[in-house]
Amino acid sequence: MLVFGTRPEAIKMCPLVNELKKRKELQTVVCVTGQHRRMLDMVLEAFDVTPDYDLSIMKDKQTLFDVTTNILNRIKEVLEKEKPDVVLVHGDTSTTFVTALACFYLQIPVGHVEAGLRTYNIYSPYPEEFNRQAVSIISKFNFAPTELSKQNLLKEGKDPDSIYVTGNTAIDALKTTVRESYTHPELEWAKGSRLIMITAHRRENLGEPMRHMFKAIRRVMDEHPDVKAIYPIHMNPVVREIADEFLGGDDRIHIIEPLDVLDFHNFLSRSYLILTDSGGIQEEAPSLGKPVLVMRDTTERPEGIAAGTLKLVGTEEETIYNEFSRLLSDKEEYEAMSKASNPYGDGHACERIADVLVRTL
């Protein structure tokens, strides 16, 4: 059984669903929590995945308390009915943590996809760092995307025989979504300009950090008339309010509704550079040859920084302004970042995970 509930999880788990369904030795059941609703459904449709169970927990202004209690109350019935041999969860969301906790209560083995990412600061990112550390205590199968993730798990005392380095399933997803023939009206609008993709939504960046981020972006945009930006905005009303205040009203910055995964990956592949506080984009962009400025104070993906394709710029206005300006003005710096190696795998992570399950279950 696979359980997931948010758009980022779905992007990385749907390719695994489809790979597992090819394996006749396995019976695959999919349960979604609906922690994100509209954005989750867009991904399910893009990968042609139909859940067997949908807990539909999302409600307006839901808190971490709401998400946790609603999933815990509803997942119990599904797990008791299906009695799975293993439950696969992904990464670090509340869906992931609560599902793993429910499995622990019912003594059902857990497989953790994208295991071993760490900042070792449980409040950054919040609550994700706590979630993934807690799941690692529970999990029987640990599918680490990189060798560094494996080393983190070994340092924490995980059994070496429980850890499998697979690569990241995000790269598998890109193989099916990025298309040379793709077109979109927004990309036509940006043609002839350097296109900047913006994403920003992290809980710990809400408020002043996000204001600093957007002020820096607006300043740089004002100084570079050959640049256009597209920001597929998150559904969170707080994010929308801040974005409208600092980025609204500029005819070279298009704030648009969330894109489905096929659109989003193709926008990334046609961008000049990316400004983000997202985790998943830090993995996707290197395989597309796109420099990324990470607007966070910490990252659980240091492999991309070591490889040179990511740069951690924090949330201070002047730092973001300086680094964004440099990438637009310094061709050598840009070329070095765009040609850096991709540390996140070869697009065969799902096959490796499926192979492990066929061998061991």
Regions found by a protein language model. Give the residues of each.
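Nucleotide-activated sugar donor-binding and catalytic core shared by glycosyltransferases
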Residues: 1-231, 236-361
